[in-house]
Amino acid sequence: MKTDEVLGIFREAGAVLEGHFILTSGLRSPVFLQKARVFMHADKTERLCRALAEKIRAAVPGKIDYVVGPAIGGLIPAYETSRHLGVPAIWVEREGGEFRLRRFEIARGARVVIVEDIVTTGLSIRETIECLRELGAEVVAAACIIDRSAGKTHVGVPLIALAEYEVPAYPPDRLPPELAAIPAVKPGSRNI
């Protein structure tokens, strides 16, 4: 699946929003990809995650034991992608501000792929990698539906993106005047 097809699915779902948004990374952007509007449609989610699973299968040699999703944004794509890979899906969730594997056990040496929804800075993936490595897992790759950095984000393992879509993102103290003139909204899920 090509980037224009992925963005077409997001547009069909009304998930490409324009305005002034505070991203979960803290950066500001004139475009927000509201993936919840896509993930509420099982058919659209299935198409995206099937294509992502195919990319993962082509890029990751050897066995994958688990797909791990960082809660909340990675839950649905991790689950659906794992279904297409034929492996269990588990997730990490925040406890005291840090990701923890609370509801599952993972064997030392288990080969895992982290699946996230949208990557901007890669912080959630890096935090998930740290959590899983502390438990002895081998993180062989990370994957996402959309990489907003267009390949510029490094997470410490190969990052497999179904689509790369570079959208401007600015620190709050360096906003262009046209963006600064619009009231900011914070639609993300980091603090959930």
From Swiss-Prot:
Keywords: Glycosyltransferase, Magnesium, Pyrimidine biosynthesis, Transferase. It comes from the Bacteria. GO terms for biological process: 'de novo' UMP biosynthetic process; pyrimidine nucleobase biosynthetic process. Gene3D superfamilies: 3.40.50.2020. 5-phospho-alpha-D-ribose 1-diphosphate binds at residues 116-124. It is an enzyme of class 2 (transferase). It catalyses: orotidine 5'-phosphate + diphosphate = orotate + 5-phospho-alpha-D-ribose 1-diphosphate. Orotate binds at residues 120, 148. It holds the Pfam family Pribosyltran. One of its GO terms (molecular function) is magnesium ion binding. Its cofactor is Mg(2+). Its EC number is 2.4.2.10. Pathway: Pyrimidine metabolism; UMP biosynthesis via de novo pathway; UMP from orotate: step 1/2. Catalyzes the transfer of a ribosyl phosphate group from 5-phosphoribose 1-diphosphate to orotate, leading to the formation of orotidine monophosphate (OMP). Homodimer. Belongs to the purine/pyrimidine phosphoribosyltransferase family. PyrE subfamily. This is Orotate phosphoribosyltransferase 2. It comes from Mesorhizobium japonicum (strain LMG 29417 / CECT 9101 / MAFF 303099). The lineage of its organism: Bacteria, Pseudomonadati, Pseudomonadota, Alphaproteobacteria, Hyphomicrobiales.
